[in-house]
C-alpha cells in the first residue's frame, strides 16, 4: 500500500502512467494467460487449483480462465494467516482494511483487497485457506528437495496451502491438483530463518555426484544435513 502511494506520487510528479499491479482489468488479463498455458498444455482437466492471494489479481484471473474451460474445478485461494484481507473481506461482506499485515511473505502483504478483484474473488474462488510462516518454510523446503528450486515465500504460499489440505486428508488421492508457484525474488537474508523454521537440521542423507577435473574421475559423496 505504501509502495502504491509512492508510485502514484511519482507518476503525478513525472507525468508517467501508473499501471496497477493487480487492481486493473488489463493487468489481470495478462496474469490470466498463466492459466491459458495450463489449459493448452493438455495436462488437464484438473479438479483443484491452488493460487496465492495478495491483492487478488492473479487468483481472480486464473480462476476466471480455468472455470471457462473446466467449470467444475475447485479454486482454492491461499493467504498468510496474518495477511488474510481477502478471506476476511468476503466473510464480512465488504472490503476490510487490516490493521496489521505480516511481511514475511512480502509479495502478498496487502492490507485491503482491490476494488475490482474483491467481487471477482468472491464469485470465482471456491475456498480460502490460510497458512503460517512455518508452513510456507516447509513448502520452500519441499520445493528445494524435490526440484532444487527456491521460490520466494509468497511464491511458495500456494504449495503450503495444498500441503496443508493434503496432510489433513482434504484432498482425495484420485483428485488431480495443480499449484501456481510464482515468484523467485528471495531475500537472501531470509534463508537462515527459512532453513531454521523448515527443520533443515534434521539428520537426513543426500547423495551428490561430484566430478574431479584434476583426476578426471567421478566421486560419490554422501551428504548429511545437520
Annotate each predicted stretch with a short phrase.
Residues 1-213, 226:
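PLP-dependent amino-acid enzyme catalytic core
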Residues 214-221:
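Conserved small/polar residues in nucleotide/adenosyl-binding loops
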